Every structure is written in C-alpha cells, then in structure tokens.
C-alpha cells in the first residue's frame, strides 16, 4: 500500500446565495481555483481530478470544470455527490486511489453555486409529475420515509446529543470572532485563491452578537 499525503490546497473566498458570485456558474468558479492550484504546485497533468458537488449542476461537472480550466482532455475527472460531505469524500476517494497504487498525483476538492444551480422538472412520465414546471429540492427519500431537510436533521442531532441553543450560540459567536480575527490578521491569505473580483468571505459577520442570535426562532 502506498502512503497518501495532502501537499497543499487553495480555496476561493466563500460567498452567499445571490451574493458576489450570483452570475458565475459553478464550473467557472471551480476552474479559476483549479488553475491557481495547478500553477502554485506546478501540476501540469495530474492522474485524476475529483470534485464534490451536492446541488446537482448536471452532467459530470468536475470534468466540465477541468476542461474550463484548460486541463488537457486526456486527464480523467469525475464528480462525487454525498451532499455536504462531497468535497471531503472526494479527498478520501483520491487517497484510496493513491493507496492502491492506481494514481500518484490527484487534485481533489469541491465546489458549489446555489445561486446558479439549474432548475429541475419532472418528465410527464414520472409518477411524481404534477404539471408544475419546476421543483427546487431534489428527492432524497422514498415514499415510505418523510423527507427531512438539513435544518431538521441538525435539530434532531442536537436533541439526540443534548446540545442546547445556548451552547450553539456560544460556538457561533466564537466562530465569527475567530474568523474576523483571522481575516484582519491575514492568517488565511496563503490558502486563498482570489477569483472573479472577490476580496473577502461574505459569511463572516464581525458584529455578530448574542442580541442578534436571540432574534432567531428557537
């Protein structure tokens, strides 16, 4: 068995839905980061490119991203979808391929754009077709199970583990405070790949407070 190592990585600034990246397709965002990764680490032709994507942007979007970045057409690329764990699972798959001796160098990660994800519609032959033109959330559970969205899943997990809202609020405040500190001190600059004119992460809230969190429904 070969050992697998993470040699480095880059990420874009993180946006929000309908924010600074709202008009930029996922494959373009991913391609811009991929180009900078390949330049920084001098990777011309990796054995594979593996990318996670959970919103179902259609086709083999990892390969679309790779070709958009100018990667040679001979380099195989494929997409992994395990929803929120897609990017991390891509890295695990890459490690397994290297462990097995199938590959030596793989670029792995994940990318999403909820702002530009395609609309979806059932074919009239599908049993769930109701005449509606579009649906916003894909089906994850068969009819014998109730669909559970991620927020409900988080609530169930918190209840099972005995985690209170007050405990989570403290983590929220700590997280935003540390993220703000890291941004102000430039601690993340060596892993940031600036793309599409972005200059900062949109999700960090320097003014986050307990008063704001108290407004949220319990």
Predicted features, each with a name:
Residues 17-19, 59, 116-122:
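Short acidic, glycine/serine/threonine-rich loops at helix termini
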Residues 52-103, 144-149, 207-218:
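Conserved catalytic cysteine-centered active-site region
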Residues 11-38, 55-56, 78-92, 104, ...:
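Active-site pocket-shaping loop/turn-to-helix segments
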Residues 82-112, 158-188:
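Active-site-proximal alpha-helical scaffold in enzymes
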Residues 35-47, 157, 161-163:
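Phosphate/pyrophosphate-binding loops at sites that engage ATP/ADP/AMP, CoA/4′-phosphopantetheine
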Residues 1-6:
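Extreme N-terminal starter segment of soluble prokaryotic enzymes
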Residues 105-156:
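Flexible glycine-/small-residue-enriched beta->alpha junction loops
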Residues 11, 23-32, 167-218:
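N-terminal extracellular/periplasmic Venus flytrap/periplasmic-binding protein-like
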């Amino acid at each position: 068995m070969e050992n697998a190592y993470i040699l480095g990585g880059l990420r874009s600034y993180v946006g929000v839905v309908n924010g600074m990246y709202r008009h930029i397709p996922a494959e373009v965002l991913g391609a811009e980061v991929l180009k900078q990764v390949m330049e920084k680490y001098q990777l011309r032709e990796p054995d594979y490119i593996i990318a996670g994507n959970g919103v179902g942007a259609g086709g083999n979007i990892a390969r679309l991203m790779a070709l958009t970045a100018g990667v040679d057409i001979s380099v195989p690329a494929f997409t992994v979808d395990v929803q929120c764990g897609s990017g991390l699972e891509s890295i695990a798959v890459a490690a397994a391929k290297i462990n097995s001796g199938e590959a030596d160098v793989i670029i792995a990660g994940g990318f999403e754009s909820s702002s530009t994800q395609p609309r979806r519609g059932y074919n009239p032959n599908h049993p769930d077709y109701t005449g509606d033109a579009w649906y916003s959330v894909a089906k994850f559970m068969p009819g014998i199970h109730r669909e559970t969205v991620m927020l409900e899943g988080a609530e169930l997990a918190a209840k099972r583990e005995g985690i209170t809202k007050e405990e989570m609020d403290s983590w929220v405040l700590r997280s935003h405070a540390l993220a703000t500190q890291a941004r102000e001190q430039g601690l993340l600059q060596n892993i940031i790949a600036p793309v599409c004119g972005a200059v900062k992460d949109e999700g960090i809230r320097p003014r986050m407070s307990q008063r704001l969190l108290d407004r949220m429904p319990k």
